[in-house]
């Protein structure tokens, strides 16, 4: 059963008399569990819809509509599938007290993997879940492998009953499911020979595995586990050599690069980022893989379209990890627009200075960095630092942040989109 939370005016749902609180029970006699059932089972032009109205009356409708026309209902969020693992590097364990309750939820949900590209370990799948993934062809999935060696993987996940990952992936691959994979590299555990084995076995698995990224483990000052540490520059350099060696094999044999190091891996190693063409279409850019080169490409292809910025001063707020890399993005943007760009790296006051990614910056740190900056016409904030409800990690809203600074603010994941409209005079 799925509950309706809103009905769009002048929609099919409104014509049927559906309302907030209506319970969607079944489609063509099949009970509805969540948004996946709803989307896939109502994809046809004609179907039977069984509902229970707020007054308790149950009605079955025969739906006929043009293919692709939405019914016009908003659904209550699905209950998030909780994680069965206890990884030493779990982000939730590194959160300070006092944040929003939702931030402490350990999610490991294949549905979110398919819909949003969230990485999942697949350790909590039930037989019914496996059947749904295959039936609905939920592909590609984003899978946290970490290690193909079962003993090492179970140690990393702190889950002695975790199923072996390669047979799991094989079963899905035999039914047409593809995967993007990642390894969160924990030094002394799944680097070195273990990482080489993982990359080799995932590559030799076949074309169903579209690629594998290697991301260095990140810890906050609140992390509760002491068996894991962040990698040194030398350890990151060694990992890069393994990644690039596997990428060279893939390039030679398949015409793709397949193996990628996250931008942060290169930053920690003190090694120059590889060129844009090695990222195979930037499929894992949301995972911090190729982010800088992706921004460069957006600027190369779209900066000439930007008008009305000559002489304006723009602050670009980011985490400290990107501070040394952003000039290669901003310098060509400044030349194309005539604007002056100032990079404003911000130390994370919520999680500690060791957390350097822009997406985890709290609103208060952003506000403090911009307070009194009347010399700026505009400040670009990292769009990934705010959620769909308009809140930063510390629950500060964008409106509250804006009220405390003297310049216009814009959220930015793509500089071209953010600067498409000139700043107010």
Residue ranges of model-derived segments:
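Structural preference for beta-strand elements that scaffold enzyme active sites
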Residues: 140-142, 178-180, 211-213, 258-260, ...
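Short, Lys/Arg- and Gly-enriched loop/turn segments at beta-strand edges
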Residues: 30-38, 57-60
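Conserved Radical SAM active-site core
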Residues: 56-58, 65-208, 218-246
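Radical SAM enzyme core and accessory elements
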Residues: 3, 269-425
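Conserved PDZ fold ligand-binding element
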Residues: 15-33
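PDZ/PDZ-like groove recognition
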Residues: 1-8
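Flexible glycine/acidic-rich beta-alpha junction loops that bind and position SAM and/or redox cofactors
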Residues: 189, 209-235, 254-277, 348-353, ...
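Terminal peptide-recognition signature
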Residues: 13, 21-24, 49, 90
